[in-house]
Amino acid sequence: MGRAFEYVILGGGVAAGYAALEFVRRNGGASSQELCIISDEHFAPYERPALSKGYLLPQDAPRLPAFHTCVGSKDELLTEEWYNEHGIVLVLGTRVISADVRQKTLLTSSGETISYKTLIVATGARAVKLEEFGVSGSDARNVCYLRNVEDADKLVGVMRSCPGGNAVVVGGGYIGMECAAALVTNNIKVTMVFPKKHCMGRLFTPKIAEFYESYYASRGVTFVKEAAVTSMQISAGKVTAVNLGNGRRLPADMVVVGVGARANTGLFDGQLVMENGGIKVNGRMQASDASVYAVGDVAAFPVKLFGGDVRRLEHVDCARRTARHAVAAMLEGTGSVGHIDYLPFFYSRVFSLSWQFYGDNAGEAVHFGDLAPPGDGDGAAPKFGAYWVRDGRVAGAFLEGGSRQEYEAVAAAVRRGAAVADVAELERRGLAFATQATGGGGKPTCAWHATVGVAAAVSIAAFACWYGWQAPYVLKRDF
């Protein structure tokens, strides 16, 4: 038993939805048996950032279908009906257990063989489990990870089961920081444990990290840094305490784990070239086998801004843009679509804070603005940032509390590699270095993370609020 398609998208995350929309807009829809999306989830593709933000709100939290792709970029809401109307076959709740790149076939767990002429791999990444560090207990009823709706539903259920209880958050990265904020908002006491000296160690400078740690502490979060979980005490299928390598024992009514992710490349090991933990692709998002493209978290692609260095970037913006580019390259033919020119972009919003980062945090960090801890200032909303200067040019920029124009200005400074003649002068001018170079930011070309055509579910303003904790400004970056 089997089916054959011209194009198959393997994976049902953010990238799959944006690839489907790009396909329809360039191709006018899909004819019978032309395009298929295979996903092991039971839902059409959706905007995953909502899971660590609005989905965890104590009141009026959104649920599907309100945040299917592509509402996160102020575009169409792609429900299952949309896919049907445009001739796209959704194969949901289906796991692919093997792939044969040479034969161009995929074998599902039900025994069906699905063949393709062109494959887009959008398998994303999986959460790293504690067992990979020699700690058992991930199957406990109150231990939570966060990658999909099923995980988020478990997290919500566990939170509601222990109001006012103690949560241990293992990990100091994106998931840890955003989940910790959500737990506090749900009236749960939070202790964060991670092995580094500061939170967000892969991105933040120590100065920036100290600000956010102080802010979180002012909201009741306790930090246990430079410490690792060695075991968990379990009773009746639930964790009751977390034991650390330094001898401390932390009482726990629930545990949230965010210790990293690994790209889902296993189906293609030994068949496609890998690099940096992902499937290596060229600037057209094409893998070592010309019939295969890879997008999103699973793709390792050359970043022009970094001199063509191959990077794997785990963020929703990258998933959206690489998906669109791959479909454009796939449909337009060799040579007609150039290589992707991506400006790396990351953001987060927690409590009343909102930051964005562009480029690369390589080189000398030059801070600006007021990084005074909460309670030390005048009560105004914080606004500060940093530039990273490498070889006399701006390689990256971070900004907390910016306006639309200001975010656009710092992004433009990174994109053009603004020249820095004097680091001391850069520190003195701070944000003005970027905004004055663009005439005060110019006309905003940015948009709220909002939605069109979903008024029956939520208003545009309400969607913007829960999608990004009063969503961040997101640039429509065409430069």
From Swiss-Prot:
Binding positions for L-ascorbate per the UniProt entry: R320, R349
Tree of life domain: Eukaryota
Catalyses which reaction(s): 2 monodehydro-L-ascorbate radical + NADH + H(+) = 2 L-ascorbate + NAD(+)
Enzyme superclass (EC): oxidoreductase
Named cofactor requirement(s): FAD
Location within or outside the cell: Peroxisome membrane
Gene3D superfamilies for the chain: 3.30.390.30, FAD/NAD(P)-binding domain (3.50.50.60)
Stretches assigned to the Cytoplasmic side: 1-3, 467-479
UniProt cross-references to InterPro entries, sorted A to Z: FAD-oxidoreductase/Apoptosis (IPR050446), FAD/NAD-bd_sf (IPR036188), FAD/NAD-binding_dom (IPR023753), FAD/NAD-linked_Rdtase_dimer_sf (IPR016156), MDHAR3-like_C (IPR048618)
Signal peptide interval: none
Topological category with respect to the lipid bilayer: Multi-pass membrane protein
Keywords, in A-Z order: FAD, Flavoprotein, Membrane, NAD, NADP, Oxidoreductase, Peroxisome, Redox-active center, Transmembrane, Transmembrane helix
Regions crossing the membrane: 4-24, 446-466
Keyword Cell cycle in record: no
Annotated positions binding FAD: G12, G13, V14, A15, E41, R48, K53, R147, N148, D297, V316, Y347
EC numbers on record: 1.6.5.4
GO cellular-component term (any): cytoplasm
Task of the protein: Catalyzes the conversion of monodehydroascorbate to ascorbate, oxidizing NADH in the process. Ascorbate is a major antioxidant against reactive oxygen species (ROS) and nitric oxide (NO).
Name of the protein this chain belongs to: Monodehydroascorbate reductase 1, peroxisomal
Organism from which the protein derives: Oryza sativa subsp. japonica (Rice)
